[in-house]
């Protein structure tokens, strides 16, 4: 991509700006520009799209998104050390990159979303990735402000996102994602793709909103899944006792001797709607 966008190699950028990845910020920089292009392509057609990126670091994925035609990239970066490197990219793509120094967990993405297609594409910091995903699944208005999420996670988290009933990885995250989105794992990334290499394999997950999820109140579904999977090895009559236990399950026509990991998303919604 150096030839494609005329910007220097990322290793030169991080050396020039003294950007060592900080463990406290969950940083692992993705420096292979072929891989960043692959991630950006997984998000689909970027033409006319505004893309939110979280934790751009030295800007490898940012460059790919812009080179592949994103109308605008809004990058949220907490680490002020990365801002000069991102400013160089902004100079190269005038008017197409907006960098906001701040904490993504405290950012109101919906308030910043313009009219037109909106995608969220990010190599998420490991320590906040799951919470950010849950935040993006939670807007009361649905379909949401975003058209797709293309996100990098530890592979174990990716497996939990796409898991369905009777899968060992199935849990609260799988229910919430399965309820409101269609999700699939696009491809894996070895630790060697990152600097410094993490101890685990990473994966890229692509999620699109279901146009009409099963009607259900978010708060009730969250409360139910927390109780059910908080004691996942117990029968539902025991794990859901504080919420109504056997009587609740009988009303929902669910066998009280079943365990949480056997319930489909539809069955979870059926119980939640009775709370």
From Swiss-Prot:
Listed CDD domains: AdoMet_MTases (cd02440)
Record EC number: 2.1.1.182
Catalytic reaction list: adenosine(1518)/adenosine(1519) in 16S rRNA + 4 S-adenosyl-L-methionine = N(6)-dimethyladenosine(1518)/N(6)-dimethyladenosine(1519) in 16S rRNA + 4 S-adenosyl-L-homocysteine + 4 H(+)
UniProt GO cellular component terms: cytosol
Coiled coil residues, start to end: none
Subcellular location: Cytoplasm
PANTHER family per record: DIMETHYLADENOSINE TRANSFERASE (PTHR11727), DIMETHYLADENOSINE TRANSFERASE-RELATED (PTHR11727:SF7)
Family, as annotated: Belongs to the class I-like SAM-binding methyltransferase superfamily. rRNA adenine N(6)-methyltransferase family. RsmA subfamily.
This protein's name: Ribosomal RNA small subunit methyltransferase A
Species for this entry: Allorhizobium ampelinum (strain ATCC BAA-846 / DSM 112012 / S4)
